[in-house]
C-alpha cells in the first residue's frame, strides 16, 4: 500500500522539517492549521519527513479513524523537498519516484537555450 500508492485519492508532502515525535493529533493539527487542509479528507495521504531523511510518517483518514504509517529505510534516504513551508500535492508518478528514492522537485528548472555553445 505505502510503496505502490494504491488506494490514495491525493498525496500531499509536508515540505521542510517535521518533528516525527508527533503522533496522530499533532500531525492532524499541522495539516489543519499550518497548511489549511482537511485531515479528515478520506483516502488522502499526508506525508511528513524529519531532519533524518531515512524515515517518513504518513497520516490518512479512513472514514472510521486515522491510520498512522511509519517507514524507515535501512540503506539510503528519501529525496525530500526542503525549500518551502507548505503542503505540496504530488501526482501518482511523483509518489512512485519518491518511494524509489528519486528527487521529485528539480533544483534547477530546465531552461531553453537559443544558441548552443557548440556546433555539430
Label every PLM stretch briefly:
Residues 1-120:
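Polybasic/polar functional segments that serve as interface/processing modules
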Amino acid at each position: 500500500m505505502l510503496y505502490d500508492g494504491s488506494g490514495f485519492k491525493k498525496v500531499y508532502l509536508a515540505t521542510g522539517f517535521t518533528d516525527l515525535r508527533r503522533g496522530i493529533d499533532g500531525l492532524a493539527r499541522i495539516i489543519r492549521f499550518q497548511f489549511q487542509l482537511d485531515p479528515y479528507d478520506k483516502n488522502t495521504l499526508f506525508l511528513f519527513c524529519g531532519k533524518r531523511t531515512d524515515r517518513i510518517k504518513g497520516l490518512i483518514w479512513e472514514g472510521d479513524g486515522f491510520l498512522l504509517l511509519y517507514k524507515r529505510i535501512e540503506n539510503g534516504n528519501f529525496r525530500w523537498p526542503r525549500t518551502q513551508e507548505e503542503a505540496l500535492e504530488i501526482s501518482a508518478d511523483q509518489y512512485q519516484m519518491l518511494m524509489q528514492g528519486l528527487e521529485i522537485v528539480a533544483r534547477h528548472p530546465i531552461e531553453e537555450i537559443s544558441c548552443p555553445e557548440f556546433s555539430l
